[in-house]
């Protein structure tokens, strides 16, 4: 029993999950739904990716580009000396000369970055200006045609750091805008937009930023207009300003964010400010709806679809279902860009999930929209760096709309299958993105997690076992309904996974005979590639836990190393446990009172406690553990079963059996919530204060053990004498 109070706390350091995380740390499925431009437009202008790709292509076969080079648009900066060598190796003298000048420009820019937090001296400023002027003059001196656009862009960049904004405006109007479409021309146009903004022409600057797909700069320029008053002001100046696309999208998504965070007033908006969102309270949101509908009807805007959809999504968020249905219906038939029409269609789909009836017509409509979303996801998906909008649309529509809809309609299996379908689509994408199938030695079973961080597993784990059997039967069937067939075809249905889960859950219920047919089908490969395998391989259920703790030896000193999750399992201990428990229970039922019955009862207690959520072999009945574990209402309380069997033995005529049982009871009660013999608090000076609980089960068990040790000291072994908890109990003045 040594340190068994602390032992319960130490279980927290095991690399296993906490079921509470399924709620507090799980996904919200609440990504922004309103999107009238691609999300990567907020990462910067589109030409950055094109310029990056230009250099990758130029060095193809000579410099390998990794994912960071591609997604971070940093290929040239990461390899600029190598790119120069490539140009020289190609004999491209014109490019080599340009690269040397470009590198000089980058070096000057780096000087400004170094001094971001300090003031340079006059001499340093003068030196930088001289270097920038030299770059400007060298760029102007170029007389070739091959790299004319690059050199013109370099002139504008040099002008920018010199503060020559008027010169840039003239250069754009006289030369830049006459160039053919290219990434270099777009970069010049972006600098020209900056010039307009600095001269006070805010909306004209936004027009230019929009042409280069640079919504992030529009956000920066329109920072003080991110509210209804700002939207009205811009609309009054230009009903078709590209800035309105950003401002309207930002407003609607901020309404959603405000409702999610639930601030009571502006003083509660700290987190929204931290994530660069704006508080939009109900009155302003309602006023926006009326303004948006007015704009859509006026005829001044070329994109009424934008405004009808914005009104519909806002009303949906505010709970005005009928208005949202009417407004999104208007949006579907209104003029707008293709992206706006797609946005209206996606939001209309979400709105219908709140009030639709699950008849054949609606499920047929849903299936068509699901397939449409699949096509949109495929078309928009590119790299891991791009957060696909339509993936989020489908995710929110399924989790926030369809799951509750099917659950309320009495179809919980379909609701769970929809949830799992989304998990499988996400898992397949990440597996593809990381090319896991190419990793040698990576078992397919390592994708199958019984993890408390997985919301599908959490739902299945909270089911009664017969319900889970029904769910598995559903996803492996061929339903008559086309939407159900679409869903179950995409749901996870590996027989090893479900045999393990169902068999383990039957064990948790104490239904050993029902568990055996499922557990018999498990392979050692599957068991070895589960996160619990490291515990399964190193602990045994017949070890007496109150006299011996079985430590886990990890494969790596790195706590979160994957090597600490997996261990080769050579036998099916869960199956062996089931068979042994059935054998012991059968013998117990046939044995009369006396020593044989007591020995059987003690052996059952040992196994019940080891297989409980408090034992070393918790993996027998669960796939994870935490310090807050306890038996669930539908499970067999293994610890309670252990106590009942120990109570039968504590009055044994066999003194050794009596001692072992009294010690075991004092130990086991330490793990049961509410049974602890004392608690610790602190006084005003932070001195430890012991609060004894004579009414608790552990206190009474310790008192019995203490009385036995006092009256029969010769029968107490050294292990019990060294027990710090018993020593503490004996030392205290425990009279209430």
Feature roles, as predicted:
Residues 4-13:
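Sec-dependent N-terminal signal peptides
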Residues 13-19:
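C-terminal segment of classical bacterial N-terminal signal peptides
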Residues 20-157, 162-736:
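Extracytoplasmic/secretory-pathway proteins
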């Amino acid at each position: 029993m040594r340190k068994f109070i602390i032992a319960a706390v130490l279980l927290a350091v095991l690399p296993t999950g906490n079921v509470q995380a399924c709620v507090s740390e799980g996904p919200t499925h609440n990504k922004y739904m309103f999107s009238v431009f691609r999300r990567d437009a907020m990462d910067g202008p589109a030409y950055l990716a094109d310029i990056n790709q230009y250099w990758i292509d130029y060095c193809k076969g000579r410099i390998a580009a990794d994912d960071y080079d591609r997604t971070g648009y940093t290929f040239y900066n990461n390899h600029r000396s190598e790119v120069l060598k490539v140009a020289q190796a190609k004999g491209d003298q014109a490019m080599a000369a340009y690269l040397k000048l470009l590198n000089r420009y980058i070096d000057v820019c780096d000087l400004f970055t170094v001094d971001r937090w300090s003031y340079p001296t006059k001499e340093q400023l003068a030196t930088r200006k001289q270097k920038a002027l030299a770059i400007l003059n060298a760029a102007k001196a170029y007389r070739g045609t091959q790299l004319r656009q690059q050199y013109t862009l370099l002139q504008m960049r040099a002008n920018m750091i010199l503060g020559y904004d008027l010169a840039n405006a003239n250069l754009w109007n006289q030369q830049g805008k006459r160039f053919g479409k290219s990434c270099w021309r777009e970069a010049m146009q972006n600098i020209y937009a900056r010039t307009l903004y600095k001269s006070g022409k805010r909306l004209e600057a936004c027009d230019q930023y929009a042409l280069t797909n640079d919504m992030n700069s529009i956000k920066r320029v329109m920072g003080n207009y991110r509210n209804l008053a700002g939207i009205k002001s811009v609309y009054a100046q230009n009903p078709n300003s590209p800035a309105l696309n950003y401002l309207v999208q930002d407003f609607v998504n901020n309404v959603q964010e405000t409702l999610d965070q639930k601030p009571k007033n502006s003083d509660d908006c700290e987190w929204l400010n931290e994530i660069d969102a704006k508080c939009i309270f109900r009155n302003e949101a309602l006023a926006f709806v009326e303004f948006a509908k007015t704009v859509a009807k006026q005829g001044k805007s070329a994109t009424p679809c934008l405004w009808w959809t914005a009104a519909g999504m806002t009303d949906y968020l505010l709970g005005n279902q009928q208005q949202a249905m009417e407004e999104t219906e208007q949006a579907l038939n209104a003029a707008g860009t293709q992206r706006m029409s797609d946005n209206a269609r996606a939001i209309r789909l979400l709105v219908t999930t709140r009030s639709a009836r699950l008849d054949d017509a609606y499920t047929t409509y849903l299936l068509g929209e699901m397939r449409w979303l699949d096509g949109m996801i495929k078309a928009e998906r590119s790299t891991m760096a791009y957060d696909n909008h339509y993936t989020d649309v489908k995710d929110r529509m399924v989790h926030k709309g369809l799951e509750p809809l099917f659950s309320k309609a009495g179809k919980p299996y379909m609701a769970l299958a929809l949830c799992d379908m989304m998990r499988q689509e996400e898992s397949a994408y990440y597996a593809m993105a990381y090319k896991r199938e190419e990793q040698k030695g990576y078992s397919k079973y390592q994708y199958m997690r019984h993890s408390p961080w997985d919301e599908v597993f959490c739902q299945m784990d909270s089911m009664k076992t017969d319900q889970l059997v029904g769910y598995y039967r559903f996803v492996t069937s061929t339903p008559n309904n086309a939407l159900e067939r679409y869903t179950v075809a995409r749901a996870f249905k590996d027989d090893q996974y479900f045999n393990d889960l169902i068999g383990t859950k039957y064990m948790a219920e104490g239904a050993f005979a029902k568990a055996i047919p499922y557990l018999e089908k498990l392979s050692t490969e599957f068991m070895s590639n589960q996160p619990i395998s490291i515990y399964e391989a190193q602990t045994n259920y017949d070890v007496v836990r109150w006299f011996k703790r079985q430590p886990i030896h990890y494969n790596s000193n790195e706590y979160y190393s994957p090597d600490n999750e997996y261990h080769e399992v050579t036998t099916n201990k869960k199956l062996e446990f089931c068979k042994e428990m059935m054998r012991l229970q059968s013998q117990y039922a046939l044995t009369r009172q006396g020593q044989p019955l007591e020995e059987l009862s003690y052996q059952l207690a040992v196994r019940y406690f080891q297989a409980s959520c408090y034992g070393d072999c918790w993996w027998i009945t669960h796939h994870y553990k935490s310090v807050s574990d306890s038996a669930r209402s539908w499970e067999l309380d293994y610890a309670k079963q252990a106590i009942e069997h120990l109570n039968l033995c504590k009055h044994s005529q066999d003194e050794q059996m009596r001692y072992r049982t009294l010690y075991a009871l004092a130990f086991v009660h330490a793990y049961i919530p509410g049974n602890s013999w004392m608690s610790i608090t602190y006084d005003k000076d932070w001195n430890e204060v012991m609060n004894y609980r004579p009414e608790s089960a552990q206190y009474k068990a310790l008192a019995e053990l203490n009385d036995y040790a006092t009256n029969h000291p010769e029968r107490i072994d050294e292990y019990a004498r060294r027990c710090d908890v018993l020593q503490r109990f004996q030392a205290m003045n425990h009279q209430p």
